[in-house]
Structure formats: structure tokens, C-alpha cells
């Protein structure tokens, strides 16, 4: 107890402790995610899988003889149900559009029969040459719905899409990337420990004052 009092009696000890605790939690979380993915690979649940676009259920899309897809309404969808025991971290494909694609997104559900919702969707990262990569959150998945484009009203879009790859090797994190935060995560690691330290400091200043009263 005296050692703790001595430590926290030092100037800047509280925020330093908060940052060290946040760093420790981040490292443990990264190690957990690394272990979880390694186990899924060993069990054969996290594997690279290549599928044709027509392996997905097409809604509002018509397949053509030349392998292209043409939209027939303003809300084209590609649905993959019964994701089951698969662990899907990323989805990637290459697409070219004859027409304005506008918004692209991927919806997911976590329970069978669950409705698709804007709260459960991700947007792609374009890496050039028409390639798009979607990174899914670490959660159980029941179904996926890819919205490959969003045509303007009364307009059609024809798209040429390569095969769709689940968990392409070059889209999954390397060992060290499990411990490197994104820009947003880095911002949170800077902000929240500081806020926590400030809150504890304010509470510590208020509680002794109440006792004296």
C-alpha cells in the first residue's frame, strides 16, 4: 500500500499508469485475436475460398452470357446465406462498371433470420485497379449481403466482376499487424486513458473534501 501511495504521489504517475494499463490491454487483445485466428486456421474454419459471383444468390441482377451482370432495379444484391462455421475476416474482388456504381457496401447478420441493418454493414477499401476489400468485424456471421452498386433511378449498370474471395491471403493481417492500431484505435488509445486519469484525479480531489465536511 505504501509503495502504491508513493508511486501515485509522484507527478504524472496517474496518467502514466492509465496509458500503461491501456497498452497492456491492447497487447493482450492483440494476442487473443492472433490466437483466435491461429486456432480457426488449424481447425480449417479460416481458409481462403474463391467463389463465382453466381454462387451467391442474385437479387436485382441478371447474369449475361458474357459473364457480366446487369442491374434490373435500384437495389441490386448478392446474398450468401448459411455462412455457418466459416470464419470470414475479409471479402475481396475486382470489378469494372459500365455506368455509375455510386455506393458499394456489405451487410452482415449475426443470427439466422436477422434483418439486414445499416448498423451492421461495412464499406470497401479501394486498393486500385478496380479491386475492393471489405474487412468484417470479429463476430459470428450468419449471412452476408453484398450491394455491388447503387444505380441511379431508372438507370442500369453492367458490371464485370471477378471471382469473390473470402479471406484472401494478402488481405489478412501479418503477425505484427495484430498489435498495430488503426488511426481511429490509436486516437482512442490516446484519448480514453487521459479521460480516465482526469476522472480519477477529480474524484480523488472531491472525496477527501467531502470527508472533511
Identify the meaning behind each predicted range.
Residues 90, 141-145:
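Short, conserved beta-strand segments of beta-strand-rich sandwich/propeller modules, principally
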Residues 110-114, 152, 165, 170:
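Solvent-exposed strand-loop boundary residues in beta-sheet-rich modules
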Residues 144, 161-164:
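Extracellular beta-strand elements of beta-rich domains used
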Residues 57-58, 62-135:
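Extracellular ligand-binding interfaces
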Residues 145-155:
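Short beta-strand-plus-loop segments that form exposed binding edges in beta-rich domains
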Residues 195-213:
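Juxtamembrane interface at the cytosolic side of transmembrane helices
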Residues 1-9, 211-213:
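N-terminal Lys/Arg-rich, disordered targeting/topogenic segments
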Amino acid at each position: 500500500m505504501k509503495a502504491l501511495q508513493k508511486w501515485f504521489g509522484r507527478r504524472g504517475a496517474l496518467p502514466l499508469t492509465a496509458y500503461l494499463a491501456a497498452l497492456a490491454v491492447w497487447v493482450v487483445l492483440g494476442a487473443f485475436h492472433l490466437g483466435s485466428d491461429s486456432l480457426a486456421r488449424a481447425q480449417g474454419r479460416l481458409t481462403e475460398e474463391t467463389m463465382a459471383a453466381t454462387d451467391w444468390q442474385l437479387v436485382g441482377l441478371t447474369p449475361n452470357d458474357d459473364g457480366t451482370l446487369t442491374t434490373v432495379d435500384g437495389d441490386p444484391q448478392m446474398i450468401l446465406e448459411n455462412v455457418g462455421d466459416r470464419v470470414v475476416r475479409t471479402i475481396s474482388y475486382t470489378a469494372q462498371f459500365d455506368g455509375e456504381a455510386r455506393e458499394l457496401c456489405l451487410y452482415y447478420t449475426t443470427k439466422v433470420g436477422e434483418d439486414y441493418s445499416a448498423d451492421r454493414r461495412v464499406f470497401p477499401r479501394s486498393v486500385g485497379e478496380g479491386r475492393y476489400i471489405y474487412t468484417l468485424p470479429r463476430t459470428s456471421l450468419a449471412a452476408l449481403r453484398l450491394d455491388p452498386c447503387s444505380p441511379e433511378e431508372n438507370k442500369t449498370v453492367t458490371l464485370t466482376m471477378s471471382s469473390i474471395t473470402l479471406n484472401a491471403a494478402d488481405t489478412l493481417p501479418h503477425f505484427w499487424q495484430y498489435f498495430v492500431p488503426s488511426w481511429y484505435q490509436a486516437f482512442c488509445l490516446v484519448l480514453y486513458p487521459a479521460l480516465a486519469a482526469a476522472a480519477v484525479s477529480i474524484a480523488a480531489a472531491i472525496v477527501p473534501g467531502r470527508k472533511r465536511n
